[in-house]
């Protein structure tokens, strides 16, 4: 499994998990976060490997569709880059650093 795809799916899952069904959440979390094989997930839920595979592929598409429409992950990346640039440019500005910490904590709650 590609590490970039795994990282992206884990990130999208963090942002959009609440919009998935319980089964979709379970399969994606086991497959991407816990590194279970299709066979292990199938055994855990008493279904075929093909059923697990189909569900995971559908859920990947759903997560990508949510990101295409809502842009929560890509916006988070842009905000993080901007915060890093500001902190790098103004390392001694305590007020600015406090404000960025507040904004970062808001991002972490969502």
Curated annotation (Swiss-Prot):
Coiled coil: none annotated. It comes from the Bacteria. Signal peptide: none annotated. InterPro entries: RNA_pol_sigma_r3/r4-like, UPF0122, UPF0122_fam_protein, WH-like_DNA-bd_sf. It holds the Pfam family UPF0122. Gene3D superfamilies: Winged helix-like DNA-binding domain superfamily/Winged helix DNA-binding domain (1.10.10.10). HAMAP family: UPF0122. NCBIfam families: PRK00118.1-1, PRK00118.1-4, PRK00118.1-6, YlxM. Belongs to the UPF0122 family. Might take part in the signal recognition particle (SRP) pathway. This is inferred from the conservation of its genetic proximity to ftsY/ffh. May be a regulatory protein. This is UPF0122 protein SPG_1182. It comes from Streptococcus pneumoniae serotype 19F (strain G54). The lineage of its organism: Bacteria, Bacillati, Bacillota, Bacilli, Lactobacillales.
């Amino acid at each position: 499994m590609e590490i970039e795809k795994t990282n992206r799916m884990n990130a999208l899952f963090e942002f959009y998990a609440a919009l998935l069904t319980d089964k979709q959440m379970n399969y994606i979390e086991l497959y991407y976060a816990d590194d279970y094989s299709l066979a292990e997930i199938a055994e855990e839920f008493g279904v075929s490997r093909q059923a697990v595979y189909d569900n995971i592929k559908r859920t990947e598409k759903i997560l990508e569709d949510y990101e295409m429409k809502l842009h929560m992950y890509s916006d988070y990346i842009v905000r993080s880059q901007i915060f890093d640039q500001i902190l790098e440019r103004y390392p001694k500005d305590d007020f600015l650093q406090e404000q960025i910490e507040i904004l970062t904590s808001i991002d972490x709650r969502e």
